[in-house]
Amino acid sequence: MSGELGLRKFLESNGHELIVTNSKDGEGCEADKHIVDADIVISQPFFPYYLTKERIAKAKNLKMAVTAGIGSDHVDLQAAMDNKIDVVEVTFCNSRSVAEHIVMMIVSLVRDYHNQHRIVNEGGWNIADAVQRSYDVEGMHIGTVAAGR
C-alpha cells in the first residue's frame, strides 16, 4: 500500500509488521516481493496494486484484500474467491473528497482552466482571450448528476 493511513502505530503495537511501498507495477516490483508473506494487502483505488490471479497464487498467506476507498476492480475476484480471500472496501470513506473534487472540477470547467493551462504550456497567453472564455460561478445555477452512492 502507499501511505500508512494512520495504521503503523496500531498495527506494530499489536505485533504486526506494516510494509509501505509505492513500487507496485511490473513483475518483480517491491510489493510483489512482500505479497508472498502478506496476510492482508491494502490498496488505494486511484493508486492500485493489481491483485491478479498470478499474484494471488503467490500469496499463500493472504486472507484479505482491502481497498482504502471504494471499488474492487483491481482485484481478480474469481481468484480471490477460489483462494478464500476476503475482498473488502471502506465504504463512504471518501465521500467528502469526492464532493470536493466535484466542486474543483466545476470551477475548473467554468474558468476554462484545462484549455488555458494547455495554452500557457505551449508558450502562449492572451489575457483578453482567456477572460472571454472564463466565467464566475456567482449567479449560475449548477446541478450535478451522480451515478454512485
Where are these regions (language model features)?
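Residue-level detector of alpha-helix initiation sites
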Residues: G71-H74, E89, C93, G148-R149
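N-terminal glycine-/charge-rich "phosphate-binding" loop or analogous flexible N-terminal tail
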Residues: M1-I40
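Rossmann-fold NAD(P)-binding glycine/threonine-rich loop
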Residues: S72-I85
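Phosphate-binding beta-alpha-beta segment of Rossmann-like dinucleotide-binding domains, i.e.
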Residues: N83-I85, T91-V145
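Short acidic active-site motifs
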Residues: E27-A31, Y50-E54, V75
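Short beta->alpha connector loops
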Residues: M1, N22-G26, P45-Y49, G69-S72, ...
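Short, conserved loop/helix-junction motifs that constitute active-site signature segments
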Residues: E54-N61
